[in-house]
């Protein structure tokens, strides 16, 4: 029996796939538990519509990420920190502090986990911080740390 998978089933198929499975398995397990639907014209057209909607949403998400990238690359986040001799900071500037400053000053909310900073910023001056906005879009945010 041909079925359209509505959910991922380990070892059998992923959501949206059309596969041929045993009749008993399809009727008694997959369809009964809502993991799959019989592959008739209605189910296939519904699947096609769902794929188009997902593609449209993905394109909109990508465009939104591109626009945010353009905006972020023009900004500079200004932070103040206490420092000692030679421009070394007491402690470091973390991604949380950068995200909070970006939210407070520019009104742009970005999750701190999207920023890639290995050890934090430990010196005064400008630092470029990569921000992963989408799996295809990465922006570079300028962070300027000045002495308090």
From Swiss-Prot:
Family: Belongs to the bacterial ribosomal protein bL9 family.
Keywords assigned: Ribonucleoprotein, Ribosomal protein, RNA-binding, rRNA-binding
PROSITE patterns: RIBOSOMAL_L9
GO molecular function: rRNA binding; structural constituent of ribosome
Gene assigned in the entry: rplI
Protein name (database record): Large ribosomal subunit protein bL9
One of the GO BP terms on file: translation
GO cellular component terms attached to this protein's record: ribonucleoprotein complex; ribosome
Entries under Gene3D superfamilies matching the protein: Ribosomal protein L9, C-terminal domain, Ribosomal protein L9, N-terminal domain
Function comment: Binds to the 23S rRNA.
């Amino acid at each position: 029996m041909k079925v359209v998978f509505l959910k991922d089933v380990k070892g059998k198929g992923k959501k949206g796939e059309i596969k041929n499975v045993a009749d008993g398995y399809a009727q008694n397990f997959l369809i009964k538990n809502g993991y799959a639907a019989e592959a008739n014209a209605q189910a296939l057209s519904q699947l096609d519509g769902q794929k188009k909607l997902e593609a449209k949403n993905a394109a909109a998400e990508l465009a939104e990420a591109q626009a945010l990238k353009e905006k972020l690359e023009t900004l500079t986040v200004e932070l103040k920190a206490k420092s000692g001799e030679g421009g070394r900071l007491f402690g470091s500037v973390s991604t949380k502090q950068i995200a909070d400053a970006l939210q407070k000053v520019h009104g742009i909310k970005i999750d701190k986990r999207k920023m890639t900073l290995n050890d934090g910023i430990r010196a005064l001056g400008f630092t470029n911080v990569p921000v992963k906005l989408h799996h295809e879009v990465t922006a570079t945010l300028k962070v300027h740390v000045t002495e308090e």
